[in-house]
């Protein structure tokens, strides 16, 4: 992950969406920024909240778009153009219906798999380019008749939130460790192997 220059946490704007399933990508970015003793600041130029963090002497920009999910690409394009960052140098974090709460995966893909935020990023920045993502599991509604659009905009229950936060903690540890592998090309497989190792040892701290 040595080539990563920007980490993006996809989310919907407006405070009422902060704790919803669709916003778990921003949960990871906020946790990462907090660990760095930094704060995300509103940046109208980038249509989002951004800051710069330093991981093992490597400066990395972080962004949470302040656009609705299906317009995320506009914000990502603004910051990537300003800093001359290419799509393959971006790590995007988002919610994933096909992973249960507590599960998380690194993916190197050029398809959106039905996610509207990723769909827009690809539409704006380039549809045939593979880029790295962290998929944070939110699961699917138990009732098959429950609308997905309503489900992703709802809040996970207490146990689900604990599982999601644990997955986020593990993913952040992989981000740190993979950046530390300066002369090693980290593949999707190697990142997920590292992730599996941490999933067996991550501890949740209750607030």
Curated annotation (Swiss-Prot):
<dbReference type="GO" id="GO:0000049">
    <property type="term" value="F:tRNA binding"/>
</dbReference>
<comment type="similarity">
    <text>Belongs to the PTH family.</text>
</comment>
<feature type="active site" description="Proton acceptor">
    <location>
        <position position="22"/>
    </location>
</feature>
<comment type="function">
    <text>Catalyzes the release of premature peptidyl moieties from peptidyl-tRNA molecules trapped in stalled 50S ribosomal subunits, and thus maintains levels of free tRNAs and 50S ribosomes.</text>
</comment>
<feature type="binding site">
    <location>
        <position position="68"/>
    </location>
    <ligand>
        <name>tRNA</name>
    </ligand>
</feature>
<dbReference type="InterPro" id="IPR036416">
    <property type="entry name" value="Pept_tRNA_hydro_sf"/>
</dbReference>
<feature type="binding site">
    <location>
        <position position="17"/>
    </location>
    <ligand>
        <name>tRNA</name>
    </ligand>
</feature>
<dbReference type="InterPro" id="IPR001328">
    <property type="entry name" value="Pept_tRNA_hydro"/>
</dbReference>
<dbReference type="GO" id="GO:0004045">
    <property type="term" value="F:peptidyl-tRNA hydrolase activity"/>
</dbReference>
<feature type="site" description="Discriminates between blocked and unblocked aminoacyl-tRNA">
    <location>
        <position position="12"/>
    </location>
</feature>
<feature type="binding site">
    <location>
        <position position="70"/>
    </location>
    <ligand>
        <name>tRNA</name>
    </ligand>
</feature>
<feature type="binding site">
    <location>
        <position position="116"/>
    </location>
    <ligand>
        <name>tRNA</name>
    </ligand>
</feature>
<keyword id="KW-0963">Cytoplasm</keyword>
<protein>
    <recommendedName>
        <fullName>Peptidyl-tRNA hydrolase</fullName>
        <ecNumber>3.1.1.29</ecNumber>
    </recommendedName>
</protein>
<dbReference type="InterPro" id="IPR018171">
    <property type="entry name" value="Pept_tRNA_hydro_CS"/>
</dbReference>
<feature type="site" description="Stabilizes the basic form of H active site to accept a proton">
    <location>
        <position position="95"/>
    </location>
</feature>
<dbReference type="GO" id="GO:0006515">
    <property type="term" value="P:protein quality control for misfolded or incompletely synthesized proteins"/>
</dbReference>
<keyword id="KW-0378">Hydrolase</keyword>
<dbReference type="Pfam" id="PF01195">
    <property type="entry name" value="Pept_tRNA_hydro"/>
</dbReference>
<dbReference type="GO" id="GO:0072344">
    <property type="term" value="P:rescue of stalled ribosome"/>
</dbReference>
<keyword id="KW-0820">tRNA-binding</keyword>
<comment type="function">
    <text>Hydrolyzes ribosome-free peptidyl-tRNAs (with 1 or more amino acids incorporated), which drop off the ribosome during protein synthesis, or as a result of ribosome stalling.</text>
</comment>
<comment type="subunit">
    <text>Monomer.</text>
</comment>
<dbReference type="GO" id="GO:0005737">
    <property type="term" value="C:cytoplasm"/>
</dbReference>
<keyword id="KW-0694">RNA-binding</keyword>
């Amino acid at each position: 992950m040595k080539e990563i220059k920007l980490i993006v946490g996809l989310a919907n704007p407006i405070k009422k969406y902060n704790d919803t399933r669709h916003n778990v990508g921003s949960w990871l970015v906020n946790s990462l920024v907090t660990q760095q003793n930094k704060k995300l600041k509103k940046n109208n130029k980038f249509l989002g909240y951004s800051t710069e963090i330093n991981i093992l002497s490597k400066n990395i920009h972080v962004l949470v778009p302040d656009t609705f999910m299906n317009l995320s690409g506009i914000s990502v394009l603004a910051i990537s153009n300003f800093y001359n960052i290419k799509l393959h140098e971006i790590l995007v974090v988002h919610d994933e219906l096909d992973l249960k709460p507590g599960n998380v995966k690194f993916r190197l893909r050029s398809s959106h798999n039905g996610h509207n935020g990723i769909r827009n990023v690809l539409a704006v920045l380039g549809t045939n380019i593979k880029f790295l993502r962290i998929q944070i599991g939110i699961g699917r509604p138990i009732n098959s008749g429950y609308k997905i659009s309503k489900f992703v905009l709802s809040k996970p229950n207490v146990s689900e939130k604990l599982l999601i936060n644990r997955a986020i903690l593990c993913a952040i540890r992989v981000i740190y460790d993979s950046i530390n592998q300066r002369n090693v090309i980290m593949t999707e497989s190697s990142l997920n192997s590292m992730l599996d190792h941490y999933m067996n040892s991550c501890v949740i701290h209750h607030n």
